[in-house]
Structure formats: C-alpha cells, structure tokens
UniProtKB/Swiss-Prot annotation:
<dbReference type="GO" id="GO:0046872">
    <property type="term" value="F:metal ion binding"/>
</dbReference>
<comment type="similarity">
    <text>Belongs to the methyltransferase superfamily. Type-7 methyltransferase family.</text>
</comment>
<protein>
    <recommendedName>
        <fullName>Methyltransferase FUS9</fullName>
        <ecNumber>2.1.1.-</ecNumber>
    </recommendedName>
</protein>
<dbReference type="Pfam" id="PF03492">
    <property type="entry name" value="Methyltransf_7"/>
</dbReference>
<dbReference type="GO" id="GO:0032259">
    <property type="term" value="P:methylation"/>
</dbReference>
<keyword id="KW-0949">S-adenosyl-L-methionine</keyword>
<keyword id="KW-0479">Metal-binding</keyword>
<dbReference type="InterPro" id="IPR042086">
    <property type="entry name" value="MeTrfase_capping"/>
</dbReference>
<feature type="binding site">
    <location>
        <position position="231"/>
    </location>
    <ligand>
        <name>Mg(2+)</name>
    </ligand>
</feature>
<comment type="pathway">
    <text>Mycotoxin biosynthesis.</text>
</comment>
<dbReference type="InterPro" id="IPR029063">
    <property type="entry name" value="SAM-dependent_MTases_sf"/>
</dbReference>
<feature type="binding site">
    <location>
        <position position="18"/>
    </location>
    <ligand>
        <name>S-adenosyl-L-homocysteine</name>
    </ligand>
</feature>
<keyword id="KW-0489">Methyltransferase</keyword>
<dbReference type="InterPro" id="IPR005299">
    <property type="entry name" value="MeTrfase_7"/>
</dbReference>
<feature type="binding site">
    <location>
        <position position="86"/>
    </location>
    <ligand>
        <name>S-adenosyl-L-homocysteine</name>
    </ligand>
</feature>
<keyword id="KW-0808">Transferase</keyword>
<dbReference type="GO" id="GO:0008168">
    <property type="term" value="F:methyltransferase activity"/>
</dbReference>
Length: 355
C-alpha cells in the first residue's frame, strides 16, 4: 500500500475553477463525439426499459454533458440512468450544480423520458457500480492520472520505467473493473493524454514555466528544496504501443472498434493567431488563460508539496500566499520564454465493445 504522500488524492481545483479553465479538455472531448454517436447506435438496439450510462472521472461535469446529449438523442428507452463518478475529494457541489442545471433544461424539452441522476464518490480504480449494470461507460481526459506514484525500488530502477509499469497496471485494473460492470454488448469510450508519436512534449511552454518558477522560489529562499522535491503530479503519458500491450491482455473481454491518437490545441491559441500581430495585452491574456488552465490541475499538487515537504510547517494562509507567488511567476516566465507559443497536447482515443 502506497503511503499518503504517494497516493493520488488531489482533486481538480474546486469552486468551479477547474470547470472555468478546462478549454483544452473540451476540445479533446469534441474529437471523441463520433465515438459516442457510434456507441449510441448500438445502445439504441438494446431491449431494455432502463439504460444506464456511467462516467468515470467527472470532475465538475462541464465536459460530460455534450457526450451525454449525443447518447440520449439516440436512445428510445423508457428510463435513463446517468451516473457521474469521481474520487471522494472531488468538488461534488459544483458537479451537482452543473448536472442539475443541464438536466432541468432538457427534461420535458429535448427529452421526454424520465432521467435519473446519481453521483458516486469513488475512484475509478475501484468498482464503481454493481456487476452487469451499465450499458455504456466513458472516461475523458482522466486515465493518464495514476492511482499512485510508484515508490523507488531498492535496485534503483529508472523512474520513467516505474511510471510506465504503474500506468500498465492501472489501465489493466480499470479495464478489468469495467468489464465486470458493463453488460455484454455494451460500450466503453476512453480518451486520455498520451505521448505524441510526433515527438513533441505536451504543453511544453507551461510545464517549463512552472518548473522555472519553482526553481527560482527555491533559489530565493521562498520555499525549501524539500518542497520542490515533494512536488509530483502523478501522471503518465502512454504511447499507442503501451495501450496495445494492455489491450492484448483483454482480447477475450473487449473488442477494439477504434484506437487512435490525435493532437489537441488549446483554443486560446487559435484566438490569439486570428490577430496577425498580437498586442502585448493579447499576449498577456493568452498567458493568463493557458497558465490558469494548467494551474486548475496542478495547484492542488503544489499545496500538497508544501504540506509534505515542510511536514505541515505552513499555515493555510501561507500556503495560499506561496501558491499565488508560484502562479504569478509562472505566468511571467511563460511571457518571457514562450510568448505566444502554441499549447498542444496528444490524446489517445478508444472505443471498446464488451464481449
């Protein structure tokens, strides 16, 4: 069992902050919509009075709704059950507001059938719903987050190899659990950040700016080196080969209909490039948007590093102050070193059928 410092128990930034800064995830979701439409055609032929759809890793729900609508439009069933799940630390208040407002708007208008909504505070690396109870499951922009950071081995095995092994175990665990939950003939749709076959580093500008800002804070004595050493975002970007190796273990359980890689650009870059010669104000606005996007994911891990690296030596107010310093300096480094640079990311997309 991993100790608490290695467990991935940090939620996305709460109080609507993550949902307000998830534009790249939205772009990635749009590329997955054809997979949902294909899965919906299969579900439409299911002879059942109740159809159950489960999302694994809903966060605040803002990128859950268009996939749900793509499915609901094609399902002529008597009742629909939508289940939104995430880790217990997730901001379920924001998720509830997002989903409820959306459901209230479509029931009786676009949707005539009863709609039943549930939220489940449970990691998708555990069983989330009863066996053979779901007709379609999906997870978007979440599965690159690992269950935990693997601890160093006595033989000094390379960290990247340990992360790759953990990512293999985690994806296999996820697929095994979902195979128990999804009925035969049901579908599973996945998208997650991947290692680009083209060789570029995902969102390299923001990542480097974050790193340099933290190094400067250490050099200036703002934070001790132990905090920087404790900072970890427990993710691994799988290659297509990594994914295929896992899928080879499930040939008797899952049929692969789609498996491909695609590039996703942060939409703020397109808005910036509409201007032939962006103003300094536009460049600063772009930096604000892309760094706030990254911080919506990473800020909680910085706060955790402050707690672990200082052994609880900071007050809540001091943690918030240091976080703000890090965010501000990251934006300054991005403007200095990566002004107007594209923010691009590779995603892997998968559509599976339960055999």
């Amino acid at each position: 069992m991993a100790d608490k410092s290695h467990v991935n128990n940090v939620p996305m930034q709460g109080n609507g902050a993550y949902s307000s800064h998830a534009a790249l995830q939205h772009e990635a979701m749009l590329k997955a919509l054809p997979l949902f439409q294909a899965a919906a055609e299969v579900i439409a032929n299911v002879d059942s009075t109740r159809i159950s759809i489960v999302e694994y890793g809903s966060a605040h729900g803002n990128n859950s709704l268009e996939p749900m609508e793509a499915i609901l439009k094609s399902i002529p069933t008597e009742s629909l059950e939508l289940l939104f799940s995430d880790r217990p630390e997730n901001d379920f208040c924001t998720l509830s507001k997002t989903v409820t407002a959306w459901a209230d708007g479509i029931v009786g208008n676009q949707l005539l059938n009863p709609l039943f909504i549930s939220m489940i505070p449970r990691s998708f690396y555990q069983q989330v719903v009863p066996p053979k109870s779901a007709h379609l499951g999906f997870s978007l922009a979440a599965l690159h987050h690992l269950d935990h950071v693997p601890q160093p081995t006595e033989d000094g095995q390379d960290e990247s190899e340990l992360l790759q092994q953990q990512a293999h175990v985690d994806l296999a665990t996820f697929l095994k659990l979902r195979s128990q939950e999804i009925v035969s003939g049901g579908s599973l749709i996945l998208s997650f950040v991947s290692q680009a076959s083209a060789g570029y580093e995902n969102y390299s500008g923001p990542v480097d700016a974050c790193r340099n800002a933290m190094i400067e804070m250490v050099q200036q004595g703002k934070i001790p080196l132990s905090v920087a050493q404790a900072f970890r975002v427990p993710t691994y970007n799988r290659t297509l080969s990594d994914v295929k190796k896992v899928m080879d273990e499930f040939t008797q359980t899952w049929k692969v209909h789609d498996l491909f890689e695609d590039d996703v650009m942060h939409p703020a870059f397109h808005k910036l490039k509409i201007q032939s010669n962006p103003s300094l104000e536009a460049s600063h606005k772009y930096a604000e948007v892309v760094i706030d996007w990254m911080m919506a994911v990473c800020s909680g891990y910085f706060t955790k590093a402050l707690q672990v690296g200082s052994q609880g030596g900071y007050t809540k107010q001091e943690e918030e102050g240091l976080l703000q310093v890090w965010v501000t300096r990251t934006k300054e480094f991005f403007i200095r070193d990566y002004k107007d640079k594209e923010v691009i990311c590779s995603f892997i997309y998968i559509r599976l059928e339960r055999l």
